[in-house]
């Protein structure tokens, strides 16, 4: 086991003392970086990049090489690898985003879906995790991730992205038995997939419930949170002599933090619509918090970025249990220098809140 040179991120998730607030950024390996665009061009297309462990490793490390302040790496992959491995036929349409050649519309469709084996069916992801861990050589921890069952189900039922989730919600209310069967199979798949990533070397994992906030409060409890709890219950929580923290992120889930805090994850991700000080008052005794700057702040000048970082740090207050991040992923049009100003500000301005 390679010793971690920087374990600030893991310590904050476990609410252990840190010198400064750790920072990383969702989609930190992405289109805003010219070096990422060059590697993607070399790969040919997005899925070819995801499925090449060496190139996935290359783009995972690019932001760390550019920004020495980053306290974690996140596996470069896509949340839709699981449905693709179930035989749904993932492809990307220019300007349309992800699409599936097969759509799930009945209980018979769901019963025919396999639960993918991480090494057999998603070996390229496990190989990428192993390659990244080797190349990181203990520089920072590596985060693995998956989409949540509800979020994956929406893509599988809709056949791709959706603005209104018409088919998914129709199935949820018209045929809850079918939706529960799909979510249960996805929960098994996600548990197996994340455990595979942990075995391969992921030192923390995040569940992205990107579309949980589209649900009513009652439907969120029944059709999203229930299945994330099943996953958390089934995850490997100790590996290589260390706790493997779990981060739960429901975009639009700010009203439900108390319920989310009961699931057993070490941390909750917050989107930018939450006040982090209020969130800490509500659930900070039970969980660490990750977030939550509006990604659009990165379009502003470095002084404005710094001011917003200062505001969020002050809102959280003194002590550990905060991982600074955006409230969602960085957008492709952001100037890379502005991301650098963000990371620098977090470390420079947060020292006063620790020690």
Swiss-Prot record:
One of its GO terms (biological process) is protoporphyrinogen IX biosynthetic process from glutamate. It holds the Pfam family URO-D. Substrate binds at residues 27-31, 78, 155, 210, 328. Pathway: Porphyrin-containing compound metabolism; protoporphyrin-IX biosynthesis; coproporphyrinogen-III from 5-aminolevulinate: step 4/4. Its EC number is 4.1.1.37. It comes from the Bacteria. It is an enzyme of class 4 (lyase). It is found in: Cytoplasm. The record marks 78 as: Transition state stabilizer. Keywords: Cytoplasm, Decarboxylase, Lyase, Porphyrin biosynthesis. GO terms for cellular component: cytosol. Gene3D superfamilies: 3.20.20.210. InterPro entries: UROD/MetE-like_sf (IPR038071), Uroporphyrinogen_deCO2ase_HemE (IPR006361), Uroporphyrinogen_deCOase (IPR000257). Its main location: cytoplasm. It catalyses: uroporphyrinogen III + 4 H(+) = coproporphyrinogen III + 4 CO2. One of its GO terms (molecular function) is uroporphyrinogen decarboxylase activity. SUPFAM superfamilies: UROD/MetE-like. HAMAP family: URO_D. Homodimer. Belongs to the uroporphyrinogen decarboxylase family. Catalyzes the decarboxylation of four acetate groups of uroporphyrinogen-III to yield coproporphyrinogen-III. NCBIfam families: hemE. This is Uroporphyrinogen decarboxylase. It comes from Pseudomonas aeruginosa (strain LESB58). The gene is hemE.
């Amino acid at each position: 086991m390679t010793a971690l040179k920087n374990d600030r991120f893991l310590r904050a998730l476990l609410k252990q003392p840190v010198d400064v607030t750790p920072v990383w950024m969702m989609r930190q390996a992405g289109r805003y970086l010219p070096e990422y665009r060059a590697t993607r061009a070399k790969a040919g297309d997005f899925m070819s990049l995801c499925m090449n462990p060496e190139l996935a490793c290359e783009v995972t490390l690019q932001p760390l090489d550019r920004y020495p302040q980053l306290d974690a790496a996140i596996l470069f992959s896509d949340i839709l690898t699981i449905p693709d491995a179930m035989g749904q036929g993932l492809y990307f349409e220019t300007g349309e985003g992800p699409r599936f050649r097969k759509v799930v519309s009945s209980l018979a469709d769901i019963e025919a879906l396999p639960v993918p084996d991480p090494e057999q069916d998603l070996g390229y992801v496990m190989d990428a995790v192993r390659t990244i861990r080797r190349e990181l050589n203990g520089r920072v921890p590596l985060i693995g991730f998956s989409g949540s069952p509800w979020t994956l189900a929406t893509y599988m039922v809709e056949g791709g992205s959706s603005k209104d989730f018409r088919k998914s919600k129709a199935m949820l209310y018209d045929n809850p038995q079918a939706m529960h069967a799909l979510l249960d199979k996805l929960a098994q798949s996600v548990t197996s997939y994340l455990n595979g990533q942990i075995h391969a070397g992921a030192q923390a994992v995040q569940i992205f419930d990107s579309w949980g906030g589209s649900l009513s409060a009652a439907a969120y409890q029944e059709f999203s949170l229930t299945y994330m709890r099943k996953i958390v219950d089934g995850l490997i929580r100790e590996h290589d002599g260390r706790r493997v923290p779990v981060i739960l992120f429901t975009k639009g889930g700010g009203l439900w933090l108390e319920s989310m805090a009961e699931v057993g994850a070490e941390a909750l991700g917050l989107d930018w619509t939450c006040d982090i000080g209020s969130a800490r008052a509500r659930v900070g005794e039970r969980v660490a918090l990750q977030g939550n700057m509006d990604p659009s702040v990165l379009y502003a000048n470095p002084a404005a970025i710094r001011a917003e970082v200062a505001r969020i740090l002050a809102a959280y207050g003194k002590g550990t249990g905060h991982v600074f991040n955006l409230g969602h992923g960085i957008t492709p049009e952001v100037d890379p220098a502005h991301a650098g100003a963000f990371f620098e500000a977090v470390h420079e301005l947060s020292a006063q809140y620790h020690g």
